[in-house]
Amino acid sequence: MELTLNEKRLLVALGPMGSADAAVLAEKMDTRREAVVQYANLAGDRGLVDVEKHVARRYVPTEEGRAYMGKGLPERQVLESFEESIPMRDLQGHPLAKIAIGWMRKKGWIAITGGVVQKTGKTAPGPDEAAFVRLAEKGEIADGEGVADLAKRGLAIEEETVAYTVSITPRGRELLSQGLDLREEAGTLTREQILSGEWKSLPLRRYDVTKLPKRAYPGKVHPYQRIIDEMRRILFDMGFEEMSGGIVQSSFWNFDALFQPQDHPAREMQDTFFLGERRPLPAGYERVRDMHEHGGETSSTGWGGTWSAEKAEQCVLRTHTTSLSIQHLAAHPKPPVKAFCIGRVYRREAIDPTHLAEFEQLEGIVMDEDVNLRHLLGFLKEFYAKMGFEKVRFRPGYFPYTEPSVEPEVYVDGLGWVELGGSGIFRQEVTAPFGIEHPVLAWGLGISRVAMLRLGLRDLRHLYRSDIEWIRETPVYGGRR
């Protein structure tokens, strides 16, 4: 059996006594008690010693408790400061009155009538006073009657003392009888020891290279947050800047500015979280109004009907981050623009394994002279490739504010082709009211869908759980790809 030098020293020190307190062994071995406990636990794992833990609890006075020692509890001091009765006004002049009056009444020592404090004659010391006297005499006391009351009042505090008794086992004594080599073992070798050959005569510490080390659990970023951070880093590397905005948006920016008709089903109560707040319309909103009613100055016919400013002022929890994209474009109508947003959006969804009422969405826009659909497909293919999806394809799609529109799909082993968001080129009805004269490429995707594929999850709700074991076991690289 291979023992460390400290285990051997422990057995040698313990042998003559058979059993001893760790503090005694520490003095004999010229080391710390904590070190002895560590050596004993190692030897205990080998069956050479038994380690017994003893926990003793005691109460010691607090700073306030020490202030009363030799004088008595506040209520006793105040009670003994007057004869049979005293006006309340005079009693309140005592420095301990605020503490003592309540306790004297609670213990039944006094009665207060007409502003006069009268002793009741029932002033025998209770368990708390007896405990306080013992505490003052000894400086510490064990738990007992009245001690808990002192602790509740902040006059005493519990302290825990842990002691360890180490006893040698028959197996340990047998090993000790065979003799132990107490020479210092070398755990490392210097260059000089190797060159001179001195290492050949040194007692070398033995290592079991087949034994697994204790598993370490360092701090880890939540797997879902790690994927979000990865997406953000990829887009920064692709030359995008990040845009941000509030989760509360007016219906104007969330719907109307994106040429979504005011009677569209997505604007119904069952799909959107409407708020009681209203916000004024921005300058130039009339161009959006005209676009809805008759197509403005474009060849579009618009949606017809009468556009309602009141509906546009109604605030909602944003249903998509595209509301931030159009505001960014309105503030930067001249190219080049290359921006993205990662943010939470809100929908009135029935919660189940594939739907949540709130989730994260990624939104990207590119505006420049002469950009077209091929540029859009190139951006998307590069982004998904950097996310680890090697096979990407596109199929035609439809979205209210883009034309043409495409839906990107990625190939996942075991699942086949999976749709991951929507994209297209903003319609003229969206860009014209804000003086944007160049094409705007736009795309968005639900980050949670990507995360589920990367992490191999089947329930969307698991992305938001605080399961420490799951966080520990999930590979840092992001899991399945």
UniProtKB/Swiss-Prot annotation:
One MF annotation (Gene Ontology) recorded for this entry: tRNA binding
Details of cofactor binding: Binds 2 magnesium ions per tetramer.
Main localization of the protein described in the UniProt heading: cytoplasm
InterPro entries xref list: aa-tRNA-synth_II, aa-tRNA-synth_II/BPL/LPL, Phe-tRNA-synth_IIc_asu, Phe_tRNA_ligase_alpha_bac/arc, Phenylalanyl-tRNA_Synthase
Classification via Pfam families: tRNA-synt_2d
Compartment(s): Cytoplasm
Binding annotation for L-phenylalanine: 322, 361-363, 401, 426
CC per GO annotation: cytoplasm
Stretches assigned to coiled coil: none
Reactions mediated catalytically: tRNA(Phe) + L-phenylalanine + ATP = L-phenylalanyl-tRNA(Phe) + AMP + diphosphate + H(+)
Cofactor: Mg(2+)
Record has Hydrolase as a keyword: no
EC annotation from Swiss-Prot or TrEMBL: 6.1.1.20
One GO term of the biological process aspect: phenylalanyl-tRNA aminoacylation
CDD domains: PheRS_alpha_core
Positions that bind Mg(2+): 403
HAMAP family: Phe_tRNA_synth_alpha2 (MF_00282)
Quaternary structure annotation from Swiss-Prot or TrEMBL: Tetramer of two alpha and two beta subunits.
Homology family: Belongs to the class-II aminoacyl-tRNA synthetase family. Phe-tRNA synthetase alpha subunit type 2 subfamily.
Protein name: Phenylalanine--tRNA ligase alpha subunit
